[in-house]
Structures are given as C-alpha cells and as structure tokens.
Amino acid sequence: MKMFKKSMSILLVIMMLASSFALCSFAADDVTVSLRIEGIDKCLFYGDVTVAADSTVLDVIKAADEAEESLTTTIVDSDYGSYLVDINGIVAGTYTDMMWDGWSYMVDGVAPDVGVSAYRVESDDVIVMYYGDPWNTGMQYPIINTEKLVDGEISFTSIDTVYDENWNAVTKECAVTGYVLTWGYNGKTVEITPDENGVCKIPYKYLTMGKHTVQIEKYAAKTDLPTVLRYAPDFSVEISFFDGIMAFFKMIFEAITSLFA
C-alpha cells in the first residue's frame, strides 16, 4: 500500500510538471507589444496587444481592431504586400494635393524599411503608428530637454534628415520650434508657446513637486496635418523635492523683485 501511494505521488508530480511545461510552452508562443496609434489631432489607441509569435505589425493592428470597438481599419492587398489605408476614417492620400500623406510607423523609435505586413514583431516592442506627410509637409520626432527645468525652461530637439548643397541626405539635430506645449500640473493643464528658439518658459507656480504630463503639438498651416509626433498620453517628467523647493523660492524672489521693478 505504501509503495502504491508513493508511486501515485510520483505520478502526480510528473503530471504537474508536464502541465506546467505545456503552459510555459503555450505562453512562449505569444508575444506582447505596446501599440500606439496617433491620428491627425489625437491618440486613437494606446495599450498592450498580445499576438502569436512570428506575427507582423499588421497582425498587431488587426488584433487591436478586433479587441477595441472604437477602432476601425481598412487594409488593401497589393503586389507589394498588404497596405494600411484607413484608420477611423483617416484615409491615406486625401489631405494633400500631392497625396503623399499617409500612415507611417516606428518600432522602438526607428522607422523600418519594410511595410507593416513584412515586419515581424518581438516581445516588448514599442510600435507607434502615426498619420502625416513626412516627405513633403515634414515631420519631427521631439526629444525632450529638461536640463533647465528647475529654471522653468523646457525645449525639444529632433534628429532630422536634411539635404546638403549636393542633395545628399544627412541627419542633423534640429530645434523644434513653433509648437504648443501642454503642461500638466495638479490635475490641470496649461498651454505654453515657446520663443523663436523653441524654448518654453514655464511659470514657477506650475513647477510643483511630482509628475507633470507633457504634450507637444504642431500642425501645418495649409493642411492641418501634424508636423511633430505627439507623445504618449501618459508621458511625463518629474520634479524632485529639491527642485520643487528651488522653484518655490525662485517664484518668491521673482514676486518680490517685481514689486520693486
């Protein structure tokens, strides 16, 4: 009897290990990625999407479409692969005379040289689909600079492709100018415009300790298409306790100085 119980115990352990291995093998067949879809003037989707291994960016978009009722897509098949034409009624080639506007994408901050139907995703990839006209109207990809945030200054640069006198393409770090900054503080937001050099001066009263959401927007005058890639809805910067105290005293000093100006 003891031998039978011992054999049954060993068998149960083996079965449990086998089932655990099967579950792990099943989970390994799935990958989870982050997907953000930026329309013309707002974010249309932002969240994690789980798809089977060896899936493409297009598969990720299809999965998001199936899971999210507010998201609709139109995909057209061609000799060059499947092409994403329309997301939520924003149809490629309808906003500019030259019809160069359309949907583009980046993975981990890099624009792949293949279409969405050819790029194979990996776990933890960060995918951003966005609408614009990068080749004609232009598009910048802002990198935030907070080195002088304690002084109330914030600015953005972008690594842009420019052309020299011989029309050779070169990359160059350029200042982002002419945008509108939306700064979050204490559950509220304030819009701030930069100077001609692209530097925003944030009043000290908005430099409270803790996290502050940051959004940047800029649109072409003729087409209203975005010319900067917006940040994710939850993008933020944090002001430390020390910097918050410094900003508070600078605000007091500024107020006293203005009384004697």
Question: Which residues are covered by each model-predicted region?
Answer:
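Ubiquitin-like/PB1-type beta-grasp interaction modules and other compact soluble beta-rich domains
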Residues: 7, 19-261
